[in-house]
Regions:
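Bacterial Sec-dependent N-terminal signal peptides
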Residues: 1-27
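Phosphate-group recognition and catalysis centered on beta-loop-alpha active-site segments
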Residues: 17-187
Length: 187
């Protein structure tokens, strides 16, 4: 019974959060974090906060492809969320956002991401969750890090980009207050 009450309270809180901004389509929910101390405090446990939401691959849905900046905007227009992204290397060592190592499922292209240069990938378009080709292109990690400033926290998964390279990108963009990395081991 205790868990049922907690679930109902959380559902009401989350429904209120989602509904609070729905009237203004230009408004997005943002996290304003200005220092690493504030980021640490943000992730510290507090019993009076609503649960964290992390939008896997950015919160893709029909007409909104995964790992796409327009999708991130759409997600934040509905709810406060961190955005999980999937960095991958191109043939010319540009880091783009792409979950799969193969382009076929999520883009108008075929083959391996790592077999294309970034210039070649720019000609491709992303597919939505229904497999429809959209007008959206594959973003770079650089673009996502710049976009996220003052809006949200990017959660950088590993894929084929080592932790040191992800951290280097975060530092290059002065994004230490709005990006974190996923590590699958301490090695």
């Amino acid at each position: 019974m205790k868990y049922l009450r907690l679930f109902i309270v959380l559902l009401i809180v989350l429904t209120g959060c989602c509904a609070s901004k729905s009237g203004n389509k230009n408004s997005i929910h943002t996290f304003k974090i200005n220092s690493t101390g504030e980021l640490k405090e943000f992730f510290s446990y507090s019993s009076d906060r609503i649960p964290f939401i992390c939008a896997h691959r950015g919160g893709s849905r029909e007409t909104f492809p995964e790992n796409c900046i327009a999708t991130f905007e759409n997600t934040l227009s509905k709810v406060h969320a961190m955005i999980e992204v999937d960095p991958r290397y191109t043939k010319d060592s540009v880091i783009v956002l792409m979950h799969d190592p193969i382009l076929d499922r999520t883009t108008s292209g075929t083959g391996r991401v790592s077999d294309y240069t970034y210039e070649e990938l720019k000609a491709l378009r992303l597919k939505d969750t229904e497999g429809n080709i959209t007008g959206h292109r594959i973003p770079t990690l650089d673009e996502a890090l710049e976009w996220a400033k003052g809006k949200t926290i990017l959660v950088l998964d590993r894929k084929d980009v080592p932790i040191a390279d992800r951290i280097k990108k975060i530092e290059e963009h002065n994004a230490v207050t709005n990006a974190i990395v996923i590590a699958y081991s301490t090695d």
